[in-house]
């Protein structure tokens, strides 16, 4: 049995001049909380294997900071982002060398994951109390983001792509962040060794 609290965890390891982030960007087959839209409030779930199909089609997926295209932290192509769907959802493992992100990781200011996508196939049905339910069956995964702000689960933006206009949707959720600063121990043991050397020299 998978506990949701465990799934929501973002594990962060600070190792010298890099930080390794590991966690679930989204859990599949789980109904979201109520989301706003022009057609009223709705609940949403992503069908299992949707991310798997998206990753097979994707030439690349970028890793951004707060969905900011000017703050590109890497990508699958770059080799510092690994994405895959397992029986829980979309898992991300990222190695980041950006100084600002490392500093925020040390200060425990990182809040969770988010992802940007274009829906390619979805279905709607009437749920309980007239609440619409949306199932996303196919999507184009554009990017995953590391957040340092409390996520607003749902957001959208309009982008012109070639001759077409696409609605890019963003989904995020705050994670229970667990930070391990490994290099503190290394620095301490190095310092102890240096002190011992000095004492032995005397």
Model-derived regions: residue spans:
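Terminal short linear interaction segments
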Residues: 175-202
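Signature of dsDNA virion morphogenesis modules
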Residues: 1-170, 178, 182
